[in-house]
Amino acid sequence: MQNLLCRVPIFAGLGDKALKLLLENAESAFVPAGDVIAREGDVNDCVYLIESGEISILKNFISSNPVVLATLGPGDFFGEMCILEALPRSATARAAAESKVVSLASSSFYRLFEKMPKQHSILLLNMARDLSRRLRRLDELYAACQ
């Protein structure tokens, strides 16, 4: 599983010791196509890494059917907002194809903060960069719709 973390941008530069610490309580699961991994509105404190397959991120809107916000594949991740805020899920994650995911509970990230604060800071900076990239992409999509 450590090889998987090495491919995920938010874990870049953390080093082997920090990655091993994050993986201490990681869980791996196969998810059949069509199964929901995390549902919008649910309280769940896991970050998910996609080892194989394809995951659709869906958002419910009052006036329409769920909209696919993104389709993610191997090396991608979702659910990272639970590390930053203790709020219900903002979207639904559903397997678009048979997939294998690894879940990391938020407690793993808190343990990293306690034991390796420098690496935790690197992780948060990487997350901020990724969220900034996603926000720029949304800005571009919004501008294109105007």
Model-derived features: where do they sit?
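Cytosolic regulatory regions built on CNB/CRP/Popeye-like sensor folds
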Residues: 1-146
